[in-house]
Regions:
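Charged interaction scaffolds used for protein-protein
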Residues: 1-9, 24, 29-46, 57-98
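A short, sequence-level motif marking secondary-structure junctions
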Residues: 14-19
C-alpha cells in the first residue's frame, strides 16, 4: 500500500523487522494490545504515527517519526489513521489458501 507525504508517494509494508521495531518502541504494551486498541477504536495519534513510521520503514524509507510531525499527508489525519489500520490488518491477515 502507499501513502502520499509532502506530494511524494511512499510504499508501506509491515515487515518482520518493522514490526519488531514498532513493538520495541511502543509506550503501551505489545502488538496484541495495539491491535486491540485499533479494534476497539481506542487508538491514539501516537499509535497511528508509530504504525505509519513502521510501514514506511518497512517500505524502505529512512526517516523518523520527527520527520512526519510537520509533513503533509494527503487526506489528512483521517487518511493516516485509515492507512495505519489497514497496515495492521494486512500484517496479521492469514494468507489465502490456494
Amino acid at each position: 500500500m502507499a501513502l502520499q507525504i509532502d506530494g511524494e508517494r511512499h510504499l508501506m509494508r509491515l515487515t518482520l523487522g518493522a514490526l519488531a521495531e514498532l513493538e520495541a518502541g511502543l509506550e503501551e504494551g505489545s502488538l496484541v494490545e495495539l491491535v486491540r486498541r485499533f479494534e476497539e477504536g481506542r487508538c491514539s495519534t501516537r499509535d497511528v504515527l508509530a504504525l505509519i513510521v513502521a510501514g514506511l520503514r518497512g517500505g524502505g524509507w529512512d526517516g523518523t517519526a520527527k520527520d512526519l510531525l510537520s509533513a503533509e499527508i494527503a487526506g489528512g489525519p483521517m487518511a493516516a489513521a485509515r492507512a495505519a489500520a489497514e497496515l495492521l490488518a494486512r500484517a496479521f491477515m492469514l494468507p489465502e489458501e490456494s
